[in-house]
Regions:
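Internal, Lys/Arg-enriched amphipathic helical interaction segments that engage polyanionic partners
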Residues: 1-28, 32
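Long, charged low-complexity segments
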Residues: 75-150
Length: 155
C-alpha cells in the first residue's frame, strides 16, 4: 500500500504542468527536477534531486540579480554561485518597506527549507518532494516578484 501511494505521488508530481518562467535555464532545471523525482528510488537518487534543486536556485538568482540594481546588504559582493546573498539582495530591493516584511520572510523561508532538505543524507521521497515544492515555490515567487508572471496585455 505504501509503495503504491509513493508511486502514485511520484507519477502525479511528474504529470503536473510546470508553467515556464521565461528563464530558460531555470525552466530546464525545474523540468529535470520533476523528472528526477518521478524516477528516484533510493537515498542517492533523492540527494541528486536536492542537488538539482540547488542548481535551479543558483540559476534563478543569476537570472534576477544585478549588482548595479541590488546593492549588497552586508557589503559582501556575492560570488556567481552565492544564491543566498543574490536572492537576499534582490528581494530587499524589490520588496521594500514594512508592508512587504511577510513577503520577504516567505521567500527567505522557502529558500531555507530547500537548502535544509537538500542536505539530508538520508532523504526519502516525502522530504525530497517537499524540497522540490519549496524550490518550485521559490522560483514561482521570484517570477511573480520580477513581473515574469504578469498577464500580457495587448493594446
Amino acid at each position: 500500500v505504501i509503495d503504491s501511494l509513493t508511486l502514485s505521488l511520484q507519477q502525479r508530481e511528474a504529470q503536473q504542468l510546470v508553467e515556464p518562467t521565461g528563464w530558460a535555464r531555470v525552466d530546464r532545471n525545474i523540468d529535470k527536477i520533476v523528472q528526477a523525482l518521478a524516477n528516484a528510488k533510493n537515498e542517492e537518487d533523492y540527494q541528486a534531486v536536492g542537488l538539482l534543486c540547488r542548481e535551479a536556485i543558483i540559476s534563478l538568482a543569476q537570472a534576477v540579480y544585478d549588482p548595479n540594481l541590488h546593492p549588497s546588504l552586508d557589503e559582501v559582493n556575492p560570488s556567481k554561485t552565492d544564491a543566498k546573498r543574490m536572492l537576499e539582495d534582490y528581494i530587499a530591493t524589490q520588496l521594500l518597506g514594512g508592508s512587504n516584511e511577510s513577503l520577504r520572510k516567505y521567500v527567505k523561508d522557502a529558500y531555507q527549507l530547500t537548502v535544509t532538505l537538500q542536505h539530508k543524507r538520508n532523504a526519502n521521497f516525502r522530504e525530497t518532494a517537499l524540497c522540490v515544492e519549496a524550490t518550485r515555490s521559490l522560483v514561482n515567487a521570484i517570477a511573480i516578484i520580477s513581473g515574469q508572471r504578469d498577464p500580457y496585455i495587448d493594446f
